[in-house]
Amino acid sequence: MNLTILRTKTALEDWCRQKHNHEINFVPTMGGLHQGHQELIKTARSFCKRKHSSQVLVSIFINPLQFDLEEDFKKYPRTFENDCKIAYEAGANAIWAPSFESVFPNGEEAHFKIQVPFSLNKYLCGASREGHFDGVATVVVRLLALVRPNRIFLGEKDWQQLVILRQLINDLGLPVLIHSIPTKRDQDGLPCSSRNVNLSKEERKKVVALPAVLQQAAQAFQENKPINLNNMKTTLEEHDLKVEYLETVDLKNLNPVNHDESKLCLLAAAVHCGNTRLIDHGFLMKRNPIVAIDGPAGAGKSTVTKKFAQKLGLIYLDTGAMYRAVTWLIQENNIDPQNSSELELILNDINLDICLSNTGNQQVLINGKDITTLIRSPTVTSQVSLVAAIGSVREKLTSQQKELGSKGGLVAEGRDIGTAVFPDAELKIFLTATAQERAKRRAIDLKKQGFSTPSLSELEKQIKERDRLDSSREIAPLSKAKDAQELITDGMNIEEVVELLINIFREKIPQEVWPTNAT
């Protein structure tokens, strides 16, 4: 078994030094590895296939700071040899199994401790496990400081922990990307957990009622059927389970919500079966997610959104192509766009067909003619802002866009997606770059499409004028939605932007609700 075992801080530092040209994908565990850990390691390994100079490091460190009782710490499974075998078979390159002294030289009192914000700690597990998440956060920060990985892989089973660690990494500005994987379950539906080995056969039969009840609730919610938490609690108690909590909370801030008024929330539970405490959850979602990506011309929205759609299996809608199509038709028929009567006639007769797919491709047809390539010409580009500012055009196309997105499962890009078309989108992004950067990208696109290319200074001038027109028009001007996240892409390649977008998406939409494609 060609698996490197690291025991000390010095050994870790030497290994990292040897791999300084490699990206490190880090899977932190406390040992007792099971199928859930295997999936984490396999996912980390899949990134190595995309980036050949990547390494997978798995840590095994039973963290005493996160246990409520000394007895629980002593009872935690310690199966190091089996853990190494599981990690190796799943694709790990190295195991780091440090002592407490290696992680906290001179003892924990000699180091800073992290205190989790009360708002993230007062409900669910945090309400009854005082200091637990403080201990988790403290150790994770320490591990990240020692390993300095590019990515960290965490499971969605411990959703509260995942939310806390995401905010911790964001607040501290740590240079690591979080990748989450959906809860892995055994054949009977019970989520994989190191604690499952403590269940007797009879207890196991009882506790499977927990995932069954949660799954039934999620299905009922999707079908717009009522959910009664008290009835669910009674059902669990009838199976001899002691319910610690059963709550619906917001996915990100973890505050209680009325599930009847929510589009997407977490239904979480903790139960005691005999001497074993177990957690599980489900997600209540009424429709598939919508992502709105806005931004100025030349910011790379189309390229990025296509790849983003492919990765997530979302339908891709380029709303700018719809305005380009109308602009092309107006030019083709020599119509003055300011002539309202002529424009009304052409809008009434137009048959604009957008062929959508989750492959990132979009075909544009007008009255049966494929104009997908024609609408990208400089002639159309020079006039599309003027046409897009016309009220009757926006009204017709916005209505069509809303209809296309009525069932969700879609990512749309344009100028006013998050403000006018899909103001209730689960995720809103404002993708932008400097005018200089956008001019360079525009020049590359024009060359690829076989069009003549103006100078960079001329392209920059055109882009700034396009920005002015888009931002100053009376109807649906280009603007960042109040709840949108701005992403400036200067100096980033397409893959980096897409990976960052997926990470932002995962803060809103779990893998269990909408999984990432394996491609």
Curated annotation (Swiss-Prot):
One of its GO terms (biological process) is nucleobase-containing small molecule interconversion. InterPro entries: Cytidylate_kin (IPR003136), Cytidylate_kinase_dom (IPR011994), P-loop_NTPase (IPR027417), Pantoate_ligase (IPR003721), Pantoate_ligase/cytidylate_kin (IPR024894), Pantoate_ligase_C (IPR042176), Rossmann-like_a/b/a_fold (IPR014729). (R)-pantoate binds at residues 66, 161. CDD domains: CMPK (cd02020), PanC (cd00560). Keywords: ATP-binding, Cytoplasm, Kinase, Ligase, Multifunctional enzyme, Nucleotide-binding, Pantothenate biosynthesis, Transferase. Beta-alanine binds at residue 66. It catalyses: (R)-pantoate + beta-alanine + ATP = (R)-pantothenate + AMP + diphosphate + H(+); CMP + ATP = CDP + ADP; dCMP + ATP = dCDP + ADP. The keyword Nucleotide-binding applies. One of its GO terms (cellular component) is cytosol. ATP binds at residues 30-37, 155-158, 192-195. Pfam families: Cytidylate_kin (PF02224), Pantoate_ligase (PF02569). Residues 1-282 are annotated as: Pantoate--beta-alanine ligase. GO terms for molecular function: ATP binding; CMP kinase activity; dCMP kinase activity; pantoate-beta-alanine ligase activity. Disulfide bonds: none annotated. SUPFAM superfamilies: Nucleotidylyl transferase (SSF52374), P-loop containing nucleoside triphosphate hydrolases (SSF52540). Pathway: Cofactor biosynthesis; (R)-pantothenate biosynthesis; (R)-pantothenate from (R)-pantoate and beta-alanine: step 1/1. It is found in: Cytoplasm. The active site is at 37 (proton donor). HAMAP family: Cytidyl_kinase_type1 (MF_00238), PanC (MF_00158), PanCY (MF_01349). Catalyzes the condensation of pantoate with beta-alanine in an ATP-dependent reaction via a pantoyl-adenylate intermediate. In the N-terminal section; belongs to the pantothenate synthetase family. In the C-terminal section; belongs to the cytidylate kinase family. Type 1 subfamily. This is Bifunctional pantoate ligase/cytidylate kinase.
